[in-house]
């Protein structure tokens, strides 16, 4: 049986797949439930939370975006502020890889917290030698 991670970092790709009832959303729901049952922290950078917010606001409405963030809070997701340590690590990922800056924050948080990053975004293949990834598929 694989060892449980110290924590999970949720990328916006994972959260949006859950919110929009995409195929990977069911696995995200299971990861969240398993994490709560096993007292494994669920983390998300505020940068990635903002990404979820603006994408949801564009596709639906600002009210739906606010509700989505509230759902994450109710699931027990801890929003992690972008301090200098996290921002510098994100900058290091950005300097070395061709990926969005928001994705660099998710990777940096997972690396700094020794957590498993939950995503299906293929941009993260570039950093999988430095970050543990729980891959999702749609």
Model-predicted segments: where are they?
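Acidic active-site catalytic centers that drive phospho-/nucleotidyl reactions
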Residues: 11, 51, 103, 121
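Short, well-structured N-terminal submotif of metal-dependent ribonuclease cores
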Residues: 1-44, 57-70
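Short beta->alpha linker loops
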Residues: 23, 47-48, 82-85, 105, ...
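Acidic, PIN/NYN-like endoribonuclease modules and their adjacent C-terminal/linker elements
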Residues: 1-7, 107-138
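Active-site neighborhoods of divalent-metal-dependent phosphate/nucleic-acid chemistry enzymes
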Residues: 3, 78-118
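A generic structural signal for short hydrophobic patches within well-formed alpha-helices
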Residues: 15-16, 49, 124-125
């Amino acid at each position: 049986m694989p060892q449980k991670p110290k924590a999970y970092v949720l990328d916006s790709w994972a959260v949006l797949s859950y919110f929009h009832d995409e195929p990977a959303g069911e696995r995200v729901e299971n990861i969240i439930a398993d994490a709560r049952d096993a007292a494994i922290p669920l983390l998300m950078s505020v940068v990635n939370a903002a990404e979820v917010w603006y994408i949801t606001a564009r596709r639906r409405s600002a009210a739906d975006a606010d509700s989505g963030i509230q759902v994450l809070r109710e699931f027990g997701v801890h929003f992690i502020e972008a301090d200098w340590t996290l921002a510098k690590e994100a900058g290091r990922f950005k300097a070395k890889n061709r990926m969005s800056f928001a994705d660099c924050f998710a990777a940096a948080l997972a690396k700094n917290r020794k957590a498993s990053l939950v995503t299906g975004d293929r941009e993260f293949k570039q950093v999988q030698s430095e970050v543990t990834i729980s891959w999702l598929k749609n």
